[in-house]
Amino acid sequence: MASVLDGLRKKLNKAYEDKGIEGDVFHIGVSEDKFKSTFSLGSPSLDMLTYNSIPEGIFIEVVGPESSGKTTLAFKIASDFIKKEKQKPKEERRHIMFVDAEGTADPYWAKVSSGYDMNDTGIETLYETPLGASAEEILTDVATAVQTGKIGLVIFDSLVSIAPKQVNGESMEKKDMGGVAKLMSDFVRRNTGLFHRYRTTFIGINGIYYSVDGYGNPERTSGGTAWKRACSLRLKTKRGPCYDKDGKELKDTDPGAIGHIIEVALLKTKFCRWDRKLGRCHLDYTRGFDILQDTIDVATFFGIIQNVSQGHYIVTDPDSGEPISEKIKGKANIKPFFEEHLDVWKRVYDKVYEMMSRKDNPNDVSFEKMLNINVEELFGINFEQEAEENG
């Protein structure tokens, strides 16, 4: 039976078609599949922040101080995007655009840290080094690339490194961040529909600078309020403690570090509950993101791995809850167990993702509560103030 609004829908879609816009703009009702096409932040701990429900076609901001893991996190997202796209038929695969405004993206570190091959021939990276180009030109390049329908992920590194044409030739004293804010405001207003139509995700990496005016939060970011409000997801990264080969956290002065923890705060989300605010992932300097260790942390959170007696752990069957391992002495020895039983790890990993995606469990306790961590104190942020600024 035809909808009473069907005639109106066809008429409105025809008007857009006459303007050269392909595809239906108007629909009757909203498809339940609208947000089923999601992508990963690359770590079970980080995906848990968002209930593993990040939709494609949105604006994301990753902000943080120097060396806090912003670009490395973007590399990991790109790596997982490639894996997902390669599962599609060749004619449906989309590619990556990487805008290296800083000119510092290292393909070797991208591959070591995250598995992101910037020279992959199956899912290619359109790499732009716009050194000397104005912000207007760079953002126009991005929109032009997205309009082809061939780009599924844009990584922009970073917003703080671009300058509008108006101030590009000015002296350093005259440059300010206001021009970038106006440009980003125009960019998101004009192109939100474009990114949504082609399901292209835009990741804007942003640095922090400090205001000395004495009012409010001294931390400032480029892009302005409109950019913040256009973002459906905002993450703040922080370099956490180093750890040794046994996973023991170290002080900065301690020897024997093989990696460090990247701590991530969820500043804003538009698509899931905002009750999980802290994620922690392990970055091994020679092996990259340690997904095994992150799986252990989240599986412990969900009770799949249980501390049964004073530092002795057991791994339980993800479905039945029955023990499937002997007592393992020390949490550091769970990882070798998984390395020897990768089939068990994969079952635990899959179950972890199933459990983290449930949005209706009132008994869930966030990582920060379980670990007794004050996220506002750790990151120096005020979530109430962030909510007001994010819109």
Segments from the language model and where they lie:
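The Walker A/P-loop phosphate-binding site
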Residues: 2-123, 147
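C-terminal regions of RecA-like/P-loop NTPase motor modules
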Residues: 1-28, 242-391
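Generic beta-sheet signal
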Residues: 60, 152-156, 200-202
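Conserved, well-folded catalytic cores of nucleic-acid-processing
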Residues: 11, 15-18, 49-53, 65, ...
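N-terminal cationic and glycine-rich segments that engage phosphates or anionic surfaces
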Residues: 167, 210-214, 310-312
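Phosphate-binding/switch region of NTP-binding enzymes
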Residues: 145, 177-302
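Charged, alpha-helix-enriched surfaces in structured cytosolic catalytic cores
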Residues: 3, 7, 41, 57, ...
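Conserved inter-motif catalytic segment of the P-loop NTP-binding fold
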Residues: 81-177, 181-186, 190
